[in-house]
């Protein structure tokens, strides 16, 4: 069918729905890591969210290694379900996967909010929280993969809106934390309000998903979905690797350069090329993109090895106990990272440098390892071995700015270059491989964070 026969997206309701769904897929991860001060305050034995980044890192609560565990248990499900996607998608209907995941995430986040009012021992609170983190992020992995499958049937604009929603999830969480801190209410009420916020976001996501079958525009495209459930994984791969000109942002902190995935154009091309090539070999495709895939792994390994495990421990060097000490980490760590990461991913919509034939990319990616010692030598009061060299706040802010924008740019660049290194009929496999290596890099970085934390 031609696009001219498609109904209009009245009031952009479908676009808004997919934007909110994108936001909902990454709200859990971002709200957990942004609330590290609250969790460390609870693990110190106090039911308070008043613990600020400037106070909680000097307490013995870091014996739980909360920062490290929340990162690892958030990323391992992504790696696991990347491997299980094909089997899972064939066994469970799409609507059950999406709606069931959203409801499970809502209930688990409601539990997290309820625990604000419940006095628990630090050990029990840690165990319950880690279990919630694992299951919430497992459902998020299923949800994200399933929604990518739906987006494969929609015009590319809706892929962009979905990814833009993901990109703003981290910024939204940081702003929610700042609002909570600035509210002036008691710490417990502030924490309760903070954790209710993502519950509202997930509830809106459920409403948006349930509304899609009632919107003519959504029905027009979603009914063209292939019958075989396994196609959802393939569509996800195509979404990741279809555009040769724009960046493809996929990570715990996403954003939205333009994607060029048009199902109508694909149908037209299919009619023009009746003789399709044989199924591409995974090994052959891997040989073509292995260096780009390695770069993607290294980018996320560096990022997750210090963010948020080390960066969330950095405090202001100011001796005054004023507002700046309370707002320093939420602003300079989480808000700055998410804004600059989003900016870095967006840059690939305008230029791609270095290109796929350049050997400069691996060198630039490896240079990011310098951020590990730089952050470890910043003002982290709780340390036993390394000295503090970069005392001033300006050092940390500068490092974070470069760290975040380089993460966003190189992630988007590698996801963009991979499909350019293979033949058109191999891009699907290339996208699937890059998805796996993305998850591998996240898990490797989360695992390394334990080592770097121990070296402080």
Swiss-Prot record:
Glycans are attached at residues 47, 56. One of its GO terms (biological process) is hypoxanthine transport. Keywords: Cell membrane, Glycoprotein, Membrane, Phosphoprotein, Transmembrane, Transmembrane helix, Transport. It is a multi-pass membrane protein. Residues 1-12, 94-97, 144-160, 214-291, 343-359, 414-431 are cytoplasmic. Pfam families: Nucleoside_tran. This is Equilibrative nucleoside transporter 2. The lineage of its organism: Eukaryota, Metazoa, Chordata, Craniata, Vertebrata. The gene is Slc29a2.
């Amino acid at each position: 069918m031609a696009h001219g026969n498609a109904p209009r997206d009245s009031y952009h309701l479908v676009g808004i729905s997919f934007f909110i769904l994108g936001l909902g897929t990454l709200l859990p991860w971002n709200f957990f890591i942004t609330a590290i001060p609250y969790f460390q305050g609870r693990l110190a034995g106090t039911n308070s969210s008043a613990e600020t980044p400037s106070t909680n890192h000097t307490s013995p609560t870091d014996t739980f290694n909360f920062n490290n565990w929340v990162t690892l248990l958030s990323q391992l499900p992504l790696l696991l379900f990347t491997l299980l996607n094909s089997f899972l998608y064939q066994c469970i209907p799409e609507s059950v996967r999406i709606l069931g995941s959203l409801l499970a995430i809502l209930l688990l986040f409601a539990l997290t909010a309820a625990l604000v009012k419940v006095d628990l021992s630090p050990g029990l609170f840690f165990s319950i929280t880690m279990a919630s983190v694992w299951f919430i992020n497992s459902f998020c992995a299923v949800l994200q993969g399933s929604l990518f499958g739906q987006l494969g049937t929609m015009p590319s604009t809706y892929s962009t809106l979905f990814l833009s929603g993901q990109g703003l999830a981290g910024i939204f969480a940081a702003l929610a934390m700042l609002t909570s801190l600035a509210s002036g209410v008691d710490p417990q009420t502030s924490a309760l309000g903070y954790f209710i916020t993502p519950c509202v976001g997930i509830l809106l996501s459920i409403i948006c998903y349930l509304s899609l079958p009632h919107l003519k525009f959504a029905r027009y495209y979603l009914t063209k979905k292939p019958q075989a459930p396994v196609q959802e994984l393939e569509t996800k791969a195509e979404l990741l690797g279809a555009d040769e000109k724009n960046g493809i942002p996929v990570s715990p902190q996403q954003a939205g350069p333009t994607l060029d995935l048009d199902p109508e154009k694909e149908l037209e091309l299919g009619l023009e090329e009746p003789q399709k090539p044989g199924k591409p070999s995974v090994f052959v495709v891997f040989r073509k993109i292995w260096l780009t895939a390695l770069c993607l792994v290294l980018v996320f390994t560096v990022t997750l090895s210090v963010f948020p495990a080390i960066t969330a421990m950095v405090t202001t060097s100011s001796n005054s106990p004023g507002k700046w000490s309370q707002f320093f980490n939420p602003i300079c760590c989480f808000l700055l990272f998410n804004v600059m990461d989003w900016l870095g991913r967006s840059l690939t919509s305008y230029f791609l440098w270095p290109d796929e034939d350049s050997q400069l990319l691996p060198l630039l990616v490896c240079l990011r390892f310098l951020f590990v010692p730089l952050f470890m030598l910043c003002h982290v009061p709780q340390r036993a071995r390394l000295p503090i060299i970069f005392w001033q706040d300006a050092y940390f802010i500068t490092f974070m700015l470069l760290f975040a924008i380089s993460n966003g740019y190189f992630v988007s660049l590698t996801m963009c270059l991979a499909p350019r290194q293979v033949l058109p009929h191999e891009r699907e496999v290339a996208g699937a491989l890059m998805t796996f290596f993305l998850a591998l890099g996240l898990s490797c970085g989360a695992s390394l964070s334990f080592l770097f934390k121990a070296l402080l």
